[in-house]
Structure formats: structure tokens, C-alpha cells
């Protein structure tokens, strides 16, 4: 069959609800690619730590590595890629989709929202925000394909950055084929 099934789980959801589905996929030999988004936090409920982060509410604890959990369940094909290495991530997903059976791509990068909040609390300079330069030719790749809510369209079709939504991680910069997205330094303490 040419049909491919792809699903996504965050690292927190993997631990609290995803493991039975993985066991089911393995047991039934599903042709299924799972992408685990490992950012080290439970963002949807307030940035609590997850078992793979090495911390709990009391402080440091022994990590429970996602890869080891998956291997323990019997997953044979696992790719681990830094989410910000977009070419490598794309390659890993394409390789996984080309194979039969159940396989997992672990897309890893710390949560930048949590990072910027911690940085701000410490009074350090925040990561740079981004701005759109005159090199923008309104291809709108940053809006339509990258999908960051920071990017907004004006009625005339030009793109602007809603700075209070920008976390400054720079992951968007390679998406513009014209190089119109550039960094802009922010002072310490300014809201990310």
C-alpha cells in the first residue's frame, strides 16, 4: 500500500498516554511513522517537567530517555534529530516514510518559550527578535509554510512581525528564500 500514516506526540503525551498506542502499533505491525516532539516540558499545562528532562518538582532526578523506552518496547528504527536542523529533520522523516513497519523520529530541541522566560527571570539578554527587511518579495513562505504566529500579513500583502509573540529562536530565518528575515537584538528583561 502507498498510504502512509504519520502521527505526532509531544514528550509529555508520550509518557502519559502514548505508550499503549506504540505497543498496539508494534503488536499489529502497523506501517506507521511516529514523530515525537521532545522539548523537555509540558507546555500545554504550564511547563511542568517531563520524565525525560531529568528534573521533577523537587529538583534533579534520573532521566528516563525516550529512545531507551522505545527500544525497550521493541522499536527497531529510531532517528534522533535536532528540530532546528531542518534539512536533517526532513531527511530523517523521508527515510522513515520510505521504510515499512513502525518507526519513530525523535525531533529534539528545548522549548524556546520556557528558555526565554528563564532567561528573562535571570535578567540576561534575550535571544534576538526578528524583523522583515526590504528583501521581502512577499512570497509568504514564513506565513504559509513555516506557520509561526509571529508573522502577520498587512492588507497590502506585506509581512510584519508581531514582536510580543516572537520568542527569538531564529528557527524561521532559513525559511525565507530571499533572506529577508534577520535578527534584531533585544535588551535584557524585555518581554519575549
Regions found by a protein language model. Name each.
Residues 1-106, 112-119:
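Thiamine diphosphate
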Residues 4-5, 31, 77-78, 174, ...:
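N-terminal export/assembly segments and adjacent metallocofactor-ligating motifs
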Residues 27-28, 55, 125, 181, ...:
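Alpha-helix boundary/interfacial micro-motifs
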Residues 46, 130-132, 186:
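A broadly tuned "polar low-complexity/structure-edge" signature
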Residues 55-58, 127-138, 163-167:
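Short, contiguous acidic/charged loop-to-helix segments that flank catalytic cores in large enzymes
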Residues 95-150:
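Glycine/aspartate-rich loop-and-adjacent alpha/beta segment that forms the canonical ThDP
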Residues 115-116, 137-162, 167, 171-189:
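Iron-sulfur cluster-binding cysteine motifs and their immediate structural context
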